[in-house]
Design a protein with these regions (language model features):
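Retroviral integrase
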Residues: 1-114
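Short, solvent-exposed helix-loop connector elements
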Residues: 115-120
Length: 120
């Protein structure tokens, strides 16, 4: 298990995950420095849709040095690899045998679901 170091600057390392809530899919993006997270509703689960949402976050906060995700097909596609190269960030995936190694995003998903449940 590789533990991720706390970065020196906000939004230099972000973790992301996709979750389902009430039959809809959402993308969570969490800043490793502060723990701040943001959520987007996804119209579908394609790499193109995930990339579009990430570009919006990057246009506000700047592109990260490192993005951590699971091994979902949205993140392992050639299109996503090209996106990482074009936007010049390092993409790190969690271990396929141990997806909990993306714990920061997993915790943000739990918090997001709790907040959404309270506001529902």
């Amino acid at each position: 298990l590789h533990l991720h170091e706390v970065p020196d600057l906000p939004w230099s390392t972000v973790a992301t995950d996709i979750f389902e809530w009430h039959c809809q899919h959402y993308l969570v993006v969490v800043d490793s420095y502060s723990g701040w997270f943001e959520i987007d509703l996804l119209k579908d689960l394609t790499s193109a849709t995930v990339i579009k949402k990430l570009k919006r976050h990057f246009s506000v906060h700047g592109a990260p040095h490192t993005l951590i995700s699971d091994n979902g097909r949205q993140f392992t596609s050639q299109r996503f690899k090209d996106f990482a190269s074009q936007w010049d960030f390092r993409h790190v995936t969690s271990s396929p045998e141990y997806p909990q190694s993306n714990g920061l995003a997993e915790r943000a998903v739990r918090s997001a679901k709790q907040l959404m449940e309270k506001s529902h």
